[in-house]
């Protein structure tokens, strides 16, 4: 496949790159190629020169993701420090790089007296990831605060898409495979930095109390069904603490799967499927994965 991948890049291009260290579950195989572009132009040039049949996907902080043990075909693109900047645009708007974390976005908003973005602190990922999936927490979603975003599409062209063109639904957008969110603008409203910090502290405490944050986990495993909570259905089906190999349903929060130490991705995904089977038998509900599963078994 090396002939299909441009070799003249300014960023870092790594063949057969281990992905387990880069994802929260700490499991899974390698990427055929891992590309960490120097800047937006480097990413554009790379995608423009990449054979069109080669699959492309973006990797942020590696939460919300199972990388299967057989590895990921094609190119995995990881946005580094050059894409992690956050800057104030006006009194209520921030311009955020696709590699910036939710914590950085919410903290910058606080420092500039911009309220309404506190919930982004609790999303364990980067701007590129939570813009793509309409990430949310504590009653708010990206669609509530997004103005527009810059996307490098598979051909290497960069386009700016307003909120109205993203087709947002619950944890979903219509962004095409292979398109990379490199920047986004978020709008809040004027607020007091101390009050903003207090709300961020409240959210942090709620997460700490209810979620297994010190574990190797992928975050929320299943989408909440209409009118219900995934964790309640998992609990009702008797899955709290259920284990397959090194993979376990968290005792603390049943919508979280954890790697207890040496789990394979096959064990983690298999546990998720067993939970889905038991919930279907118990409640008649087909739970839908929120965690993305990628690669070869």
Curated annotation (Swiss-Prot):
A GO biological-process term: peptidoglycan biosynthetic process
SUPFAM superfamilies for the chain: FAD-binding/transporter-associated domain-like (SSF56176), Uridine diphospho-N-Acetylenolpyruvylglucosamine reductase, MurB, C-terminal domain (SSF56194)
Active site: 171, 220, 290
Keyword Cell membrane: no
Required cofactor(s): FAD
PROSITE patterns: FAD_PCMH
Alphabetized GO MF terms: FAD binding; UDP-N-acetylmuramate dehydrogenase activity
Location, primary (coarse class): cytoplasm
Record-listed E.C. numbers: 1.3.1.98
Pfam family, one: FAD_binding_4
Catalysed reactions listed for this entry: UDP-N-acetyl-alpha-D-muramate + NADP(+) = UDP-N-acetyl-3-O-(1-carboxyvinyl)-alpha-D-glucosamine + NADPH + H(+)
Tree of life domain: Bacteria
Pathway as given in its UniProt record: Cell wall biogenesis; peptidoglycan biosynthesis
Subcellular location: Cytoplasm
GO cellular component: cytosol
Role, per record: Cell wall formation.
Family: Belongs to the MurB family.
Protein name per the record: UDP-N-acetylenolpyruvoylglucosamine reductase
Lineage: Bacteria, Pseudomonadati, Pseudomonadota, Alphaproteobacteria, Sphingomonadales
Gene symbol of the encoding locus: murB
């Amino acid at each position: 496949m090396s002939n299909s991948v441009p070799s003249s890049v300014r960023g870092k291009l790594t063949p057969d790159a281990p992905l387990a260290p880069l994802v929260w579950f700490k499991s899974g195989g390698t990427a055929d190629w891992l590309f960490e572009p120097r800047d937006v132009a480097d990413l554009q040039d790379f995608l423009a020169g990449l054979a069109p049949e080669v699959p492309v996907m973006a990797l942020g902080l590696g939460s919300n993701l199972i990388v299967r043990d057989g590895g990921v075909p094609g190119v995995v693109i990881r946005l580094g420090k050059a894409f992690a900047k956050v800057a104030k645009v006006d009194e209520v708007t921030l311009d955020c790089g696709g590699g910036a974390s939710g914590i950085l976005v919410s903290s910058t908003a606080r420092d500039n007296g911009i309220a309404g973005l506190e919930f982004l602190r609790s999303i364990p990922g980067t701007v590129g990831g939570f813009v793509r999936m309409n990430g949310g927490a504590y009653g708010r979603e990206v669609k509530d605060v997004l103005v527009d975003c810059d996307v490098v599409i598979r051909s290497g062209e960069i386009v700016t898409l307003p909120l109205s063109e993203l087709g947002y639904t619950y944890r979903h957008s219509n962004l095409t495979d292979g398109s990379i969110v490199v920047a986004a603008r978020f709008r809040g409203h004027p607020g007091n930095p101390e009050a903003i910090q207090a709300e961020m502290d409240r959210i942090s405490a709620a997460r700490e109390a209810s979620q297994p944050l010190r574990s190797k986990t992928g975050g929320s495993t299943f989408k909440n069904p209409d009118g219900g909570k995934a964790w309640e259905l998992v609990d009702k089906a008797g899955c709290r603490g259920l284990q397959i190999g090194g993979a376990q349903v968290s005792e603390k929060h049943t919508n979280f799967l954890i790697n207890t130490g040496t789990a394979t991705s096959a064990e983690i995904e298999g546990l998720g499927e067993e939970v889905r089977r038991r919930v279907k038998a118990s409640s008649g509900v087909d739970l839908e994965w929120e965690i993305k599963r990628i690669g070869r078994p």
